[in-house]
């Protein structure tokens, strides 16, 4: 109901804090697909604050990382989560995909993570 009352006003930007917190996978997916549709059909920019790194990888094309009041980077989620110079000071956990890429000797771990996510998006 709350988001519907906001959408009536046709905002240019929606700022959402943990929009999928506490949701099961089905509801999580419904919420995110709904937000994706709003973005694509109405051109609404959606800014999400999240601690769910998989959600960030799956549904966003840009990540802004702030730690201790400082902007650390603006980049793709895959690059953010595979760059130890960003993850460490931002207290972010690198993904298991990154760890697998490192253990398998894949040089471009960022590209590996991005390709996996692209595949996952395609089959969803």
What residue spans do the PLM features occupy?
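Helical segment within the ABC ATPase nucleotide-binding domain
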Residues: 29-41
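A short, surface-exposed alpha-helical micro-motif characterized by mixed small hydrophobic
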Residues: 56-58
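ABC ATPase nucleotide-binding domains
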Residues: 87-124
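Catalytic Walker B motif of ABC-type/P-loop ATPase nucleotide-binding domains
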Residues: 14-17
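A short, proline-enriched helix->beta-strand linker immediately N-terminal to the Walker B motif
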Residues: 8-12
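H-loop/switch region of ABC-family ATPase nucleotide-binding domains
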Residues: 50-51
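Conserved beta-strand-loop-alpha-helix hinge in the C-terminal portion
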Residues: 70-97
């Amino acid at each position: 109901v709350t988001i519907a009352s906001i959408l009536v006003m046709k905002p240019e930007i929606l700022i959402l804090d943990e929009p999928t917190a506490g949701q099961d996978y089905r509801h999580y997916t419904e919420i995110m697909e709904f937000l994706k549709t709003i973005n694509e059909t109405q051109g609404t920019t959606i800014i999400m604050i999240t601690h769910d790194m998989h959600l960030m990888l799956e549904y966003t094309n840009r990540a802004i990382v702030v730690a201790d009041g400082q902007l650390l980077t603006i980049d793709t989620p895959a690059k953010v989560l595979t760059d130890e110079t960003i993850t460490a000071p931002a207290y972010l956990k690198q993904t298991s995909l990154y760890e697998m890429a490192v253990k398998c000797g894949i040089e471009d771990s960022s590209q590996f993570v991005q390709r996996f996510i692209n595949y996952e998006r395609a089959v969803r």
